[in-house]
C-alpha cells in the first residue's frame, strides 16, 4: 500500500514522466540533462499511423535533411529533451526527416538602425542588461531552418550600415561563406516616418542628392541588397512625419529607385489604405519586379485590392498580423501562394494575449521546446531567449499559427512561403540545391 501511494504521488508530481516516456519507447534512447551526450546515433522505431506501420527515425524536429518517403509528421509529447538549456520535459520530438526552410523577409537585426535590443538595451533605456547576442540570435535562426534574412533599413545611413553588416555576417574570419548563419541581405529605402530626412540639409543638400546617395548604396552593394524599402505610408505616427511629406517621398522612391533598379519593393502601410492603394495603382508599372506589403494588419478587402494590382504582390505576415480574432480570420483568407512569413524582430512578437496563440499550446511550441522558456533581460545568459523580444527563429511560431488557422500543416505553409520568398527576392540566384 505504501508503495502504491508513493507511486501515485510521483505520478501526480510528474516525477515519473521521464521514466514512463522511456518505457513507452524502449527502442529510443532518452537522455536527461547532465548525462553523457556521446551516443548520438538515432534508433529506429515503428510508428503506427492511420492503420499502417512505418519505420522511421526518431529525431528532433529540427534535424537536418534525410531521405524519406513519408509525408506524415507524427510527434511525441513530454519526452525528455537533451538540450542543457531546456526543461527536462520539453515537449516536441518528431520523426520529420526534412527540416523546414524559411526566409525571414523582415527583421531589424542591425543595431545601427536604432533597434538595440540585440545589444542588450531595452525600452529605449541607457542601462545595458547584457552583451550583444545578435550572432547567437542568428545562429538560433539558422538552427531552426531560417536560410535567408532581409535586414530592413529606413534611412540612408541605416542602408549603408545594413549593407556593410550583412557582408560581414556572410563571411567567416577567413573570408569564406559563414555556414553557421543565415545568408543576410538588406533593403535600401526610407521609412515613411523618416521621410523628413529628404528635406534635412544636415543629411544631404537636397532631396535629389539624397536619392542619388541611396542609388549609390544599391549600386555598390548589389551582392547584398535584395529590395527597395522600407517605404510607404504610416498614418498611425504622424507626429514623426506629416501625410503630405510621406506621400511625396513615397512617390519619389517609386519613380527613382524602383524605376531604375530591377528589385522588388518592401512596403509599409499603417492606417493609410486609400492613399497607399492609389499611389501604388498610379505606379503599377513599378511593381513589375514584385512587392510585399509587410506586417499586414488590414482587412480582407484591403489585401484583395492590393493583390489585384499585380500577380507579383505578396502579403507579409508576422506576430502583429495575428493579434485579434479578426486579424486571424484575415490571415486565414490570404492565399498561401501570395503569402510571405516574417518576424519584424525584435518587434511584432507573438504574445500570450494574442488570439493566434490558441493554435500554439505550450506543449506544442516548437521554439520553446528547443531553446527553453524566455527569460527577463536581467536574467540573461548566453543562449537564452528574452521575454517579449522577438527573434528570427520565432518565424516557426508564426508558421504554426498560420497552419493552425488554415487547417493545414506547418510543412505545407513553410514550403509555400519559402518558395514565394525566393521567387520574389532571389529569382535568379543559384542556391546549389
Residue ranges and their predicted role:
Residues 2-9, 72:
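Compositionally biased low-complexity segments enriched in histidine and/or tyrosine
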Residues 1, 40-42:
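Conserved small/polar residues in nucleotide/adenosyl-binding loops
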Residues 6-9, 22, 29:
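Short, low-structural-confidence N-terminal segments
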Amino acid at each position: 500500500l505504501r508503495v502504491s501511494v508513493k507511486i501515485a504521488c510521483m505520478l501526480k508530481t510528474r516525477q515519473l514522466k521521464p521514466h514512463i516516456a522511456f518505457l513507452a519507447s524502449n527502442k529510443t534512447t532518452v537522455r536527461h540533462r547532465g548525462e553523457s551526450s556521446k551516443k548520438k546515433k538515432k534508433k529506429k522505431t515503428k510508428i503506427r499511423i492511420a492503420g499502417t506501420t512505418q519505420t522511421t527515425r526518431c529525431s528532433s524536429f529540427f534535424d537536418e535533411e534525410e531521405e524519406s518517403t513519408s509525408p506524415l509528421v507524427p510527434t511525441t509529447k513530454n519526452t525528455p529533451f537533451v538540450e542543457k538549456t531546456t526543461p527536462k520535459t520539453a515537449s516536441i520530438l518528431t520523426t520529420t526527416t526534412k527540416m523546414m526552410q524559411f526566409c525571414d523577409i523582415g527583421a531589424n537585426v542591425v543595431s545601427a538602425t536604432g533597434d538595440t535590443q540585440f545589444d542588450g538595451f531595452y525600452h529605449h533605456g541607457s542601462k545595458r542588461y547584457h552583451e550583444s547576442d545578435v550572432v547567437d540570435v542568428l545562429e538560433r535562426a539558422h538552427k531552426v531552418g531560417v536560410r535567408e534574412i532581409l535586414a530592413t533599413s529606413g534611412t540612408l545611413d541605416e542602408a549603408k550600415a545594413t549593407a556593410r553588416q550583412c557582408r560581414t555576417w556572410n563571411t567567416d574570419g577567413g573570408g569564406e561563406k559563414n555556414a553557421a548563419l543565415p545568408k543576410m541581405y538588406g533593403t535600401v529605402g526610407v521609412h515613411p516616418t523618416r521621410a523628413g530626412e529628404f528635406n534635412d540639409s544636415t543629411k544631404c543638400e537636397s532631396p535629389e542628392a539624397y536619392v542619388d546617395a541611396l542609388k549609390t548604396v544599391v549600386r555598390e552593394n548589389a551582392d547584398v541588397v535584395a529590395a527597395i524599402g522600407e517605404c510607404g505610408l504610416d498614418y498611425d505616427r504622424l507626429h514623426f512625419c506629416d501625410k503630405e511629406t510621406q506621400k511625396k517621398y513615397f512617390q519619389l522612391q517609386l519613380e527613382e529607385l524602383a524605376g531604375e533598379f530591377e528589385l522588388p519593393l518592401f512596403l509599409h502601410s499603417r492606417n493609410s489604405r486609400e492613399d497607399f492603394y492609389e499611389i501604388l495603382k498610379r505606379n503599377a508599372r513599378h511593381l513589375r519586379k514584385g512587392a510585399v506589403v509587410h506586417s499586414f494588419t488590414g482587412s480582407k478587402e484591403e489585401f484583395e485590392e492590393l493583390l489585384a494590382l499585380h500577380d507579383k504582390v505578396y502579403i507579409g505576415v508576422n506576430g502583429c498580423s495575428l493579434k485579434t480574432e479578426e486579424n486571424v480570420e484575415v490571415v486565414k483568407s490570404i492565399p498561401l501562394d501570395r503569402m510571405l512569413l516574417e518576424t519584424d524582430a525584435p518587434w511584432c512578437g507573438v504574445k500570450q494575449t494574442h488570439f493566434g496563440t490558441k493554435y500554439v499550446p505550450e506543449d506544442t511550441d516548437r521554439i520553446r521546446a528547443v531553446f527553453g522558456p524566455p527569460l527577463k533581460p536581467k536574467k540573461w545568459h548566453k543562449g537564452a531567449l528574452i521575454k517579449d523580444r522577438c527573434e528570427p527563429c520565432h518565424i516557426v511560431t508564426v508558421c504554426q499559427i498560420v497552419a493552425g488557422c488554415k487547417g493545414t500543416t506547418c510543412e505545407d505553409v513553410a514550403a509555400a512561403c519559402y518558395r514565394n520568398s525566393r521567387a520574389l527576392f532571389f529569382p535568379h540566384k543559384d542556391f546549389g540545391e
